[in-house]
Amino acid sequence: MKTLLTTTLLLLTLSFYAQDAKEIIRKAEEKMRGKESAYTEMTIEVIRPKWTRTMGLKSWSRGNDYSLMVLTEPAKDAGTAFLKRHKEVWNWVPSIERSIKMPPSMMMQSWMGTDMSNDDLVRESSSVTDYTHALGKDSIIDGKKCWKVILTPKPDAAVVWGKVVAFVDQKDYVQLKAEQYDEDGYLVNEMLGSEVKEMDGVILATRLELIPIEKEGQKTIMTINTIKFNEVYDDAFFTVHNMKNIR
């Protein structure tokens, strides 16, 4: 009886911590998405040893199922758009006036020559629902005490990474660092969040650096210039037709 009680308490404790870890990730994601929706304007810098390229991006999102993004610069790429509706992802290329439905196999490919994958951009996979979550040892990042949350893909989840380790500020639920590992356990990328400030009533990291570990002198920097939360967008906004006309 005593052994059964001990086992039950252990299972309940493990369940509590797993739920707690999942809730931490959910709250951290809400910082970028809003509870309902978000509109964002950002600058993206692609840095390479011998050159640098800058892009402008506008994005609209509603929950985890709907998002629409359009490039605003450089001029040659302006109007290029990406749409996510549930598990469907579309790309509009204005130079050839063609919309392309992107298959799951394209999610791992680089987005527009950056260090981000297509999945990073449209977030076809969800760090909340497609992974299991466990708490590791607390860490200090940029002088702030952070939870260390280990995300492991669920067996049937169509995700890019074999494991993700996220470090979330315990005060404001801001993700200050993330490590992305491949299926063999090798560290591929680091994501660093900085320049934490309040925007539209929410404290968040406004500068995100994605750094490939084995590519010296290479990284992608995303800077949030404007963000508005909980705007109203209906289903008709997130359509292939609107993707072709959004600016």
Q: How would you label these PLM feature ranges?
A:
Residues 9-18:
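Hydrophobic h-region of N-terminal signal peptides that target proteins for export
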Residues 1-7:
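Positively charged n-region of N-terminal signal peptides that target proteins for export
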Residues 19-37, 43-46, 52-53, 78-81, ...:
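Flexible, processing/modification-adjacent segments and terminal tails
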Residues 42-76:
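N-terminal, post-signal-peptide region of Sec/Tat-exported proteins
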Residues 40, 67-71, 89-93, 99-101, ...:
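Short hydrophobic/aromatic-rich beta-strand segments that constitute the beta-sheet cores
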Residues 63-64, 86-87, 200:
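Residue-level signal for tight coil/turn positions that link beta-strands
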Residues 57-61, 81-82, 136-138, 194-196:
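Short, exposed beta-strand/loop patches in secreted or surface proteins that constitute
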Residues 18, 122, 142-239:
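Gly/Pro-enriched, hydrophobic low-complexity segments
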